[in-house]
Amino acid sequence: EIMPSLVGSEMCIRDSDYVPESIKTKCFEKYGKTLEGAAAALFEFNKALIDALYDIVPAVKPQAAYYEMYGWQGVKALCDTIAYAKSKGMFVITDGKRNDIGTTMEAYATAHLGHTDVAGESIDAFGADALTVNGYLGTDGIKPLAKICDSDDKGIFVLVKTSNPSSGELQDMKLETNESVYEHMGKMCEGWGEDLMGKHGYSAVGAVVGATYPEQLGEMRAKLPHTFFLVPGYGAQGGGADDVKNAFDENGLGAIINSSRGIMCAWKKQGLTEDDFAVAARKEAERMRDEIVGCIGKIKLG
């Protein structure tokens, strides 16, 4: 049995609107109001958050788009963030929602999870531990990822039932089998993960299932016993501990709960200044952890 402090949230590191003015001023003075300056500010912000959270939060989920908008400089900040988080022992999930087939998907998998061959040298391009993906193209889009998950001990999270308000327009549609699209996608995740099982009964193929639909979350936990859940929607999107508790199995395993703005902008709720963002983030992460643990109890590894 281990202590439930390993239950934690992810922080989704986003764009420079969340970065305190003091950090932006420092970076803009050095690099100017340029893409390089913005990227430097992002990385400084990220480092401070990681330093404040790495011992209580198991994973970090940088959203690739908020780095790509700053060009190659932003992409470098993403690489640096991944490397720094991993140096602190954190599990890194790149939120890229990649979606393609064949050799193109293999290239995405190699870039984010695998090793790139450069004239016979094997080099990590991004080096994340897991990647969010869209499974709409079917098995052709998942096979290249599964291959690298197997060879390099990596993971993927397939979009199944997402937390956005319009997700039901497609995901809730009923098929001829009377199951919904999201239920069928979940079933496919179970199948894709059959040969990628870990020692605690979960596969390398996970599912994104939103906290904003708690009833479906509980149903999917029962139907997908070997699929690890990434659960967005906690905090700023309205989800709470009661909404996410059904994502976990009877041993308190099987899910990681995502909080982004709720952690990054916690200083606003706590009546602090933006320069206290790291202290506030830690306090909020501890509160969130304790709230979730209060619902699910201690984690048990049998």
Task: List PLM regions with ranges.
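Single conserved hydrophobic/aromatic residue that forms the stacking wall/gate
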Residues: E1-G8, I13
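Conserved, mostly hydrophobic/aromatic
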Residues: E10, V60, D95, L131, ...
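Active-site mouth loops of central-metabolism enzymes
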Residues: S22-K47, N99, D172-E179
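Acidic (Asp/Glu)-rich catalytic clusters
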Residues: I50-V57, I82-S87, A146-D152, R221-L224, ...
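N-terminal active-site wall of soluble small-molecule enzyme domains
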Residues: I56-P58, P62-A119, D124, Y213-Q216
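Conserved anion-binding
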Residues: D100-V205
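A C-terminal functional module that forms or caps the active site or interfaces directly
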Residues: A207, A211-N258, G262-A266
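C-terminal helical cap(s) of enzyme catalytic domains, especially alpha/beta-barrels
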Residues: V244-E250, C265-L301
